[in-house]
Structures are given as structure tokens and as C-alpha cells.
Amino acid sequence: MNIEEFISSLAEKGISLSDRQLEQFELYYRMLVEWNEKMNLTSITEKKDVYLKHFYDSITAAFYIDFEKVTTLCDVGAGAGFPSLPIKICFPHLHVTIVDSLNKRITFLETLSDALQLEHTSFVHDRAETFGQRKDVRESFDLVTARAVARLSVLSELCLPLAKKNGVFAALKAAAADEELKAGQKAIKVLGGELEQVHSFTLPVEESERNIMIIRKTKSTPKKYPRKPGTPNKSPIEG
């Protein structure tokens, strides 16, 4: 996806980018590639691929979520900042919190955020399991996102405790196997959520499958969740 395709594909969805925003994406790309030589941030480094598989792919969440109605966003395990920072560039009013367990990645994100002059961004070096038990952040976010390979049952335990009542957890997945959704239903219910919709589509250019699962937080998460670090992965709420 070249820059022109990036601009026109987003414009078709009602997202028009200013010169300033395009400069921010360009700098994001350059810093990602530069820092990637020092640490493992991504295996995708070709410019056209970064714009499609990282930037555009992250922004697809805005095709199904009205970000004008979102103020606070928490991104769990965002790695190199996906999906939250491309979304933040498009919607500057957002207050974004990123939680990541690797300090090196947090250092990259802080440096990147300063270079892009992003306001209202905070980066927390913590495990999602511990962060989700913090009284000052638990059940406080309008939207919680995760673009990760972990199973839906595991992601739900890490993310739903952070969403406020009537807030949303959005899981961005490459492919949504029906069995993963079925296996995740119990966790979603136990944690106070309800599957609202699964949006399935293909990325332009390469036509690869993408799914965005929208889970609405309908009631408070029981206090014991998330369980201690490592437990959600070892024994997910399934069955």
C-alpha cells in the first residue's frame, strides 16, 4: 500500500488526513525501522507493508467504532504502538494509555510519542494482570483494545476488567476461528461482557482476512479477575 492508496482508502471511509498527520505517520515509520535494528519491534519493515499491515490495519477499528464518542482508550500489550497510536494520530482528542510488559518497548513508545508531539498519552511498564487490579485504572476506560495472538478467553481476562460499565473491549484478530469465539464465550460472560458483533473483512491490496470483535461491558468484573500474572494464559476461563 503506497501513500496515495493509504490516503484514498481512509478517505473512502470518511477519514481524511491532514499534511501534519501524514508527516506523523512518515516519522512513525522511520522511527519504527530505526529502532527495530536495536530491538525486535516488528518483522514487517517494508514501507508499503508497514502502511498496510500496521497503520491501516490499526485504523480499521475506526470503521466500526465511533471514536468521536470515545475519550479514554487503553491498549493492552501494544508492542510498537498498534493499534492505539495510529488511531491516536487520526483522532488527536483521545487520551491513550498503553500497557506493555517490556520496558524496552515502553522506552521506544515514549520517545516516539515525544517525536510525534502526541498529547494525552501515557505508557505503563506492567503486566496486564497487575495493571487490571489497580483501583485507579480498573473499570475506567471507554475502550480497551488488543491486537494480539493470544486466545480470546485470555485477552478477555486481561482487557475486560479495565473497561468501564457500558464501555467496549475490541479484539483485533487476523482470523477469527469459530471455535476460538465459542471457547471465549464463557470468559466474556464471567468477566461481565457480552459479544455485540464480529466485523469480518479483508485488508485491501493483499486481501487477507481480518476480524474485529466488539465486546460490550454490561456489568462489573468480579474482583478476583484478572488473576495473578501467567494464570490467564496457563488456565484460561473456558469449558
UniProtKB/Swiss-Prot annotation:
GO MF annotation: an example: rRNA (guanine-N7-)-methyltransferase activity
Keyword Cytoplasm: yes
Annotated EC: 2.1.1.-
Main location: cytoplasm
Signal peptide region: none
GO CC annotation terms, alphabetical: cytosol
Entry keyword Transferase: yes
Source domain of life: Bacteria
Keywords, ordered alphabetically: Cytoplasm, Methyltransferase, rRNA processing, S-adenosyl-L-methionine, Transferase
Compositional bias of kind Basic residues: 216-227
Protein residues bound to S-adenosyl-L-methionine: 77, 82, 128-129, 147
Compartments it resides in: Cytoplasm
Enzyme class: transferase
Disordered: annotated span: 215-239
Known role: Specifically methylates the N7 position of guanine in position 535 of 16S rRNA.
Family: Belongs to the methyltransferase superfamily. RNA methyltransferase RsmG family.
Protein name per Swiss-Prot or TrEMBL: Ribosomal RNA small subunit methyltransferase G
Source organism per UniProt: Bacillus velezensis (strain DSM 23117 / BGSC 10A6 / LMG 26770 / FZB42) (Bacillus amyloliquefaciens subsp. plantarum)
Lineage of origin: Bacteria, Bacillati, Bacillota, Bacilli, Bacillales
